[in-house]
Structures are given as C-alpha cells and as structure tokens.
C-alpha cells in the first residue's frame, strides 16, 4: 500500500476478508507497486494486491491486483472475478487463514541494488518521492549505490500524497536539480509506478524519452536482439520516429 490515510484501513479490511475466507496473507506494509509484483513471485503467492490510487490526489484510493506471475490481471480475468461476485454464493471456509508481516524492504532494496551494473559514486541525484511509497526505498537504494541524494517530499502523513509534488508536479524537483548542481532528478508518484526525470539542466525527460534512451543503450550494448521496443497507446510518434531512425521497431 501507499501512504494515504485510507490505505491502512482498506488493506486491513482486505486482509481480514481473505483470512475469513480461509486464505493466508503476507502484509508488506508501505511498498512501491513494483515491489508487490516482485514479492508475489518470490513468495509463491497466488495473488498480490496494492492498495493505492497511484498518481491521484490523497482522498482517492483503489486496488491493483497481480496474478501469481507478478503481472496485472488480464481483462478476461478481471471480468471473471466480477462475475464471481454477482453469480456465486460463497461457501463458509473450513478454517480461518492467517495474516502476518512480510519481511520486505531490505530484500527489495537488495534486489534493486543488484540490478545496477555500475556504482553511482560521485553522482548527485534529486529524488521527489511524492510523499508516497518511494520515500522509504528510493533514497536508501541510491545511497547504497554510492550516490549523493537530495530527497524531497518523503513525508508519510497520508494526507499529502501527490499534493503539488511527484510525477505530476516536477517543478520543485527541476528547481532542486539546478540549485544543487545535481546530475539528474527523478519524480515518482504515490505508489512509485510512474516516473518523470530531469537532466542536469533541469529539462524534463518524460517516459517517451526514457524509452528511447533505454532502447538505444541496450541496442548499443548488443542486448536488444530483435531491435524491438514495447510502448503503450500513449507513446507518441516522435519517439517512434527516433527509434526507427536507429533501426528499432516500436510495438504498442
């Protein structure tokens, strides 16, 4: 879950319902959305659920559900779940399940550090954590990699998630990059599944530009064997043309 006031209540209600139905729950506490996908596979769970409204204001909330493979449920599976609520009478469980805490942040931080191919010593980064889940993970990971970190908006009071900060409001991050002479800056949203970056000049680097940077880097390193990048329906034609100019196809 993220840091919203309502997230604890919804998460506890969800856990109670699962346990009452005979299921067992591992409660990860406040974690980025990607961490839940990671732990679903690591723990061999049947499902994972994130309580968050992502980049929306703090008064909103919702659920994101992952399957056993760590991927979001398909539309077909979501429709099937909805039909279950409408069509089936639920039998009483044979036994009540348990809810216990998931030993988490350290292992997830270890995983993220292991993904970095080179240390970040001598680099300075501004991290805007949107007063959300990234605040407990991102600064720690960057510092472990040797970087100097300027951390913004890491409060966890539950009432200021995404409030004039984070990925939808990168202005303070960009200003901090210029003021501190940082090499780059990164803005997350409340559940850390959205990212906006800035370069050393404070210029915004959005998702399309990040996709192009990653794809061209992997191609140059010989790690893009099919010369294919995957975007979304929102990926703009400018990004597609840039990729095509380097012999990379875009699949939406």
Question: Model-found features: residue ranges?
Answer:
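Short glycine-rich phosphate-binding loop at a beta-alpha junction
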Residues: 1-3, 26, 124-127, 227-233
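Gly/Ser/Thr-enriched, mixed-charge loops and adjacent short helices
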Residues: 61-180
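Short beta-strand-to-turn element immediately C-terminal to the catalytic PLP-Schiff-base lysine
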Residues: 65-68, 196-200, 244
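Alpha-helix capping and helix-loop boundary segments enriched in small/acidic/polar residues
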Residues: 5, 129, 160-165, 202-206, ...
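Structured core elements
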Residues: 50, 64, 126, 187, ...
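Proline/glycine-rich low-complexity loops and linkers
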Residues: 19, 28, 79-110, 114, ...
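N-terminal small/polar loop signature for handling phosphorylated ligands or for N-terminal nucleophile
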Residues: 2-60, 140-198
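Short, surface-exposed alpha-helical segments at coil->helix boundaries
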Residues: 7-12, 78, 135-139, 240
